[in-house]
Every structure is written in structure tokens, then in C-alpha cells.
Amino acid sequence: SRSSDGGRTWKPIEGINFPGDGHQDGMGFLNSGRWLIAVVTSNQPWSHGGHTEMGLVGGYRTFKREGQAADRHITFWHSDDQGKTWTDSKPFKGPFKWVSPSVSHFIESDDGSIALPVFGCVTDEDMGSYSSSNGVVRSHDGGKTWGDFSFVFRTQPPGPDDYQPEPRYSEMDIAQLPNGHWVAFSRNERITMGPVGWGSTDVALSTNLGRTWRRTGGSLQGVSQQKGVVLPDGAIALTFRSHSWAGPGVAISYDEGRS
């Protein structure tokens, strides 16, 4: 559907013919008028593995997770006739064993590049415990080809008190500020502390369109499925599913995610 009054009313767009089975894992509309979609394809059934209780630390149970396996890639499609016909790209997996978009929107920058935040597992050891990392993949030709990738948050090898690579970085959104800076918000879970994980958000800042990142020191506890929206005054509103696992929450930052 299309709206010409700020989303108050909508009209169906006739003649759209999405490729494949019609589902999209990401969708965007470029300033040129080109439409983009990202579609995830699973090349094997997802094996969830299992977890083993390893004992107590400070009165809390600890766990080892292993046996998970998957194989997924992303295909990007673009359309220049408002969705009537589509052209696909070569499948993208980059450095990952499996990869998926971490949000459903693209980022278009002033230099003409387009980026999509993604996450996945890099090594077999990472994949076994679902110790995922995330980053951005770019296109420099209007979405025709993809493959220029940079990590944002990367899981680390097991430490002395870990049973698998830690932590798990999964759901991530990136807000592009008016000054060109990017602020990334990523879900962060310590797998050792439970088979589902304890969610928090780590924040990182990039001043070079996502090439390199530094942590801001900002963090939110007990959140997941976060989305960042840039407000008219330049602040960031971060919406998320709160610790209740049902209630929505929102936090606002005026200092690029530092607080």
C-alpha cells in the first residue's frame, strides 16, 4: 500500500509481483525510486541442538549449549518499475556459516552506498552454541551487487568461566544521524547463564559509515528486539520489548547513545 498523507490513509499498489513465495526479510525504497528486498533462503533444516547444566556460580545455574547447525544465505532483489519485475543478486553469506538480516530496513547514505545490518555465526564452534556476531553488508551500485562487509559486534572465544564463545550478539538496529554518524544497538546475551539468555543492549558509534566502531559505554538491561528512530531534534528514540517479554519500552538518547 502507498500513503501520500503521512500514513493517515493508504491505497493498494496494483501490479506488484514479489519474487519467489512473496515473503521479504527486508525491504527499502531508495531516493532514486528503486525498490529493494532481502530474502533469506535456508539450505538445510535448522538444528537447535541442546543445553547441559554445568553447575552453580554465585547461586545461579550455568549452561553449555552445543549442537546447533544451520545454513542460510541472503538474496537481494531490486525493481525499477514499482515491484512489477525484479532482478536478483548473487547470494550473500560473507564470513558466516549462516546469515540473516537483523532488521527489516536498509540504510542509504549520502555517498550513494546502501547497507543492511545482518547477523550470523562465523565458525563451527560459534554455530554450535548459537554464539552469533553482527555487522553490515553494503552495495555500491544501487543494490545490484553486495559483499562489502564490516563487523560491528563480534563474539569472542571462550574465557576461563565460559563453556562456549560469548556473548551472543543478535538483533541489531543502526540509526543514521543527521551528522552522518551511525549508532548501533545490539542485543547481547551471555549464553552460559541460561539456554534462553539474559538480554541487554550494547551501543557502538561509527563516524565512517560503519567501517569501524567504538563502544559508547551506554547499555540497557533486559531489552530485546530494539529499533532506533531518529527524532526531528536529532535525538534517538530506541523502542524495545522490555523485561516483561510483553510490554513495550522506549529510551531516548541525546548524546549518540552514550546515555
Model region roles, listed by residue range:
Residues 1-259:
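Asp-box/BNR beta-propeller blade signature and adjacent active/binding-site loops
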